[in-house]
Amino acid sequence: MTRLRKFESVFGENWVVGRYLLPALEKLGRAHTGVVLDLACGESPFRKCFPYARQYLRVDHDPLDAEVIRGDMRCVPLPDRSADAVLLCQAITDVPEPSAVLKEVRRLLRAGGSVIVFESMCYPEHDAPHDYFRLMPEGLRAVADTVGLQVRECMRLGGLFTRFASLWNTCLMGGLMRYRALRPIGLLGVAAGNVFCYALDRMAPHPRLASDYLAVLAPRDAALDLDSPASGSGN
């Protein structure tokens, strides 16, 4: 299953997160008509969220196709002011020094540009040994401030049961799904857990228990501090 399908399919492990993330990211993406740079792009699951981008550049340390630029997020092989928008989805916590990533992003950003950051506050351990920490919204603010960036908007996504769905699905994916004969049961368990947890989250939203967040950063002199602590809405 591709990474995007994990967000879109009810049988995907990130379906509940996707119900909040995809509408919010698509709304932001439609406003970008210039050059979008996707760092640590992987399978480029969010490319379709930027339908009007004039150019969609992708960088990854281990490219999956020939169009992806090979490079480290801390030293991207592109000239200064290459992008109008930079996308960082669950990326900056995969390096031991996130400030180095944001400093490089600041170099790549054109005047009037913005940085879109998606991070999870409770995602299970992944990509070991390159999974260093979970960066809370205030942590992102603090790191961004050191390189001249400011959080312009921060949307908290999901809630307590989004967290539960993430852990439940990780257990199923790492347990039943390893055995071919049990995969149908595992997939049904994932789907049932997704629907149940999403319904509970919608009935009892609690922003302080949000599982993820989507933030927009801009150079400090161009940013307004418009933090939005309310939980993001899904379809």
Language-model features: where?
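Conserved N-terminal segment of class I S-adenosyl-L-methionine
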Residues: 1-80, 85-89, 210-213, 220-235
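GHKL-family ATP-binding catalytic core of two-component histidine kinases
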Residues: 77-79, 96, 136
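Glycine/Thr-rich phosphate-binding loops of Rossmann-like dinucleotide-binding domains
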Residues: 46-47, 96, 125
